[in-house]
């Protein structure tokens, strides 16, 4: 009996060893940004690895104004690409490889100002859905905001603005989406830029969550998109407007940012979210930082 047990024991372990899911490969693009990319990139990397789902590589571009011809990340090696990049244009073959990767089913995550990059690259604007600044106006597409439903407003005007940094409540608009499923209907985020007046093609776009932008400073007085998804070909895109960091990393220490970023990255990579909502996720009355 004992000898038979020894023979069967390795077979009993097979489901654990042979069929354990391989980690998802994630790539963070960075190296140029109008925010502190040397501070934010490790925070994004930690958020991904803390899930236990991802291994992470980082592709750092040449500095602004330098020769970009050798910047050619191997997008197709990864389940998801995270952009923490706002800077010089990529080489033509890198742009083509990125579009092909996304169209064929690659996952893409847009963090904060990454959606403001490449205003003259139509495919990138379509992939992000919305963007701002860099000369964007009604030619790039409508403003998108929430007024009991998604509003696509073609009125003329600049794309992209924000009031001074402040804390705000985020309202879930699509509670049945895998990213937002089981989240509180409203939750408090740390001091951050609340982007407003974003515009773009807004095709195949779903707004998952919004925040009311109080009409002070450059505030719009409207409910602005905060978390959104875009379908581009077979690719899944998660776009978070959160994550303003210039010296003070509070916005990326917010559990509201961390958990939605983690869930969005998993969804972009796989189409599913297996992570439970963390026990320290905030409601609308209590801020949570890590």
Task: Annotate each language-model stretch with its function.
Residues 1-9:
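Bacterial N-terminal signal peptides that target proteins for export
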Residues 8-17:
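Bacterial N-terminal signal peptides
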Residues 21, 25-32, 36-118:
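Helical hinge/lid and interdomain linker segments adjacent to catalytic or ligand-binding clefts
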Residues 21-24, 39, 50, 73, ...:
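Extracellular ligand-binding/catalytic regions of CAZymes and related secreted enzymes
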Residues 29, 88-178:
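A glycine-rich, often tryptophan-bearing local segment used as a flexible ligand/cofactor-contacting loop or short
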Residues 33-34, 88, 115-117, 185, ...:
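Short, solvent-exposed loop/turn segments at secondary-structure junctions
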Residues 49, 55-57, 77, 146-236:
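Catalytic beta-strand/loop cores that center a nucleophilic Ser/Cys/Thr
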Residues 105-109, 208, 238:
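Structural detector of well-ordered beta-strand residues that form the stable sheet scaffold
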């Amino acid at each position: 009996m004992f000898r038979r047990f020894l023979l069967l024991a390795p077979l009993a372990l097979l489901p654990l060893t042979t069929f354990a899911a391989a980690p998802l490969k994630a790539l963070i693009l960075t190296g140029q940004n109008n925010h502190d990319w040397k501070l934010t990139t490790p925070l994004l990397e930690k958020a991904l690895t803390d899930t236990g789902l991802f291994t992470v590589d980082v592709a750092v571009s040449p500095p602004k104004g330098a020769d970009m011809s050798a910047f050619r990340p191997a997008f197709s090696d990864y389940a998801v690409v995270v952009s923490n990049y706002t800077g010089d244009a990529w080489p033509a073959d890198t742009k083509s490889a990125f579009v092909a990767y996304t169209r064929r089913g690659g996952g893409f995550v847009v963090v904060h100002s990454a959606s403001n990059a490449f205003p003259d690259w139509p495919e990138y604007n379509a992939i992000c859905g919305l963007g701002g600044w860099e000369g964007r106006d009604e030619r790039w597409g409508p403003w998108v905001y929430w007024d009991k439903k998604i509003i696509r407003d073609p009125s003329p005007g600049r794309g992209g603005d924000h009031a001074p940094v402040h804390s705000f409540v985020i309202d879930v608009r699509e509670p049945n989406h895998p990213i937002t499923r089981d989240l509180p209907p409203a939750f408090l985020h740390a001091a951050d830029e609340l982007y407003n007046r974003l515009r773009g093609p807004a095709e195949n776009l779903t707004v998952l969550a919004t925040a009311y932008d109080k009409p002070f400073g450059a505030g719009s007085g409207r409910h602005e998109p905060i978390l959104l998804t875009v379908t581009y070909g077979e690719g899944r895109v998660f776009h978070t407007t959160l994550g303003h960091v210039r010296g003070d990393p509070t916005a990326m220490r917010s559990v509201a940012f961390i958990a939605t970023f983690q869930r969005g990255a998993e969804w972009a990579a796989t189409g599913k979210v297996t992570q439970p909502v963390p026990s320290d996720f905030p409601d609308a009355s209590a801020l949570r930082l890590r």
